């Protein structure tokens, strides 16, 4: 049981690090702690930075057809990737908050570095399609997006990406406080995280690019590979 395990932990650095994990998976009312650990003053700035500094550079490296400045025009509207990508990661993060718990398996402390091994539920991306199917009066809008996506998905990575984000956000009525369900009907912790968080002697936590991408289940591999050795 998570609460019981946390009560047994007396190291203040571990407690401070776990507060960040709590702020994602248990109670997002404390998400300000995550903002602070990334040096952001509000959620909009946090998700913009997450997109521009953490996610986009990885995509630029990986895909030659990626451009942050992509704008998708559809049915008289313009959808800039730089606006809708951060919004997508916001609603996807909202969903993680519905987990209500995570499974803490182990932790290590080396100086100011706290290493956590835990399992957590993950977002069921199929639920975006389920939400889209509820818009009975607007199926032509969604089908059109699928058709557009199929046209470009092989040749233009960022165009494919923005179309997918528009589809997923439209399924949630473009509401930034909306969310989809997690995998499994009840608590189902399928994602294993190896996370590193720096905590100074005053209890101030800092989390770097690779580890925030891991915590929010955006790109888990780099941090998992870097931190896993601490537990072997």
Give the role of each language-model region.
Residues 1-95:
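Core segments of small alpha/beta cavity-forming domains
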